């Protein structure tokens, strides 16, 4: 019963109950849920929006658990991947206050898969992208593709633009040799976005593995707005 109570109290960011349970049974600090996540992973995953509490409630819980001696880099499972607490803060709670707290306490952004950038990009969380990059996550880390190209293909354009402005390689080619512009023309993304990308360094003349450039691909479309966007 105590194990269930402490898991629920941490997930609900109930610091009063969590403190009381740990004071009574310090060994509960080692509890993990069925997915192999410890109390710190659960605290970092708690959605303040869902719980309708301030982001600072999560920071207080995380700080409390760290002060009790929990390892800031201990890994828990996200799917099949072992991930540190900062990943859960980026991918699950999406809480920049917790991300900043962890970084201030010494968490390594680079310990998260993809430096946390793919998770932040998937959600379009620009503030978390900024925190992670400032903390040392390599902007062009490759996990199949780069965070920029992934964000672009996911149509998370605020994230993709942010990464481009921070210096991401906008001409990165995937395994088929395709750049963001190739994908943009193929998917008929808003021509204004294609124009923006060209203005920020994307080349419409890079050929893919089939020797087709974005400009050539656009020239074959009936809708000539896509070709004009690459001028």
Please name every model-derived segment.
Residues 8-13, 42-58, 88-95, 119-125, ...:
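Ankyrin repeat A-helix N-terminal signature
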Residues 2-6, 31-49, 75-88, 110-119, ...:
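Ankyrin-repeat boundary/"N-cap" motif
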Residues 115-175:
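Eukaryotic tandem repeat interaction scaffolds
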Residues 7-11, 21-24:
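N-terminal alpha-helical scaffold/docking segments in eukaryotic complex subunits
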Residues 22-27, 60-71, 100-108, 130-138, ...:
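Ankyrin repeat domain, specifically the short helix-to-loop turn at the C-terminus of the second helix
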Residues 1-5, 135, 166, 193-195, ...:
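Ankyrin-repeat-protein effector appendages
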Residues 58-108, 114-116:
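A generic tandem-repeat structural signature
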Residues 28, 46, 50, 72, ...:
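Alpha-solenoid repeat scaffolds
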């Amino acid at each position: 019963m105590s194990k269930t109570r402490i898991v629920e109290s941490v997930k609900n960011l109930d610091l009063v109950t969590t403190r009381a349970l740990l004071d009574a049974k310090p060994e509960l600090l080692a509890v993990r849920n069925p997915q192999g996540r410890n109390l710190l992973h659960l605290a970092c995953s708690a959605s303040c929006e869902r719980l309708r509490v301030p982001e600072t409630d999560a920071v207080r819980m995380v700080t409390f658990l760290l002060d009790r001696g929990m390892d800031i880099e201990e890994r828990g499972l996200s799917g099949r991947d072992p991930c540190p607490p900062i990943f859960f803060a980026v991918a699950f709670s999406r809480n920049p206050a917790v991300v900043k707290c962890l970084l201030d306490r010494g968490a390594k952004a680079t310990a998260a898969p993809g430096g946390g950038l793919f998770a932040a990009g998937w959600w379009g969380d620009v503030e978390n992208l900024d925190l992670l990059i400032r903390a040392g996550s390599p902007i062009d880390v490759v996990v199949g593709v780069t965070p920029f190209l992934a964000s672009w293909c996911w149509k998370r354009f605020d994230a993709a633009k942010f990464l481009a402005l921070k210096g991401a390689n906008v001409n990165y080619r995937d395994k088929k040799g395709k750049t963001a512009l190739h994908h943009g023309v193929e998917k008929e993304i808003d021509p204004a976005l294609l124009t923006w990308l060209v203005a920020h360094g994307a080349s419409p003349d890079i050929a893919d593995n089939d020797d087709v450039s974005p400009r050539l691909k656009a020239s074959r479309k009936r809708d000539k707005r896509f070709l004009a966007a690459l001028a």
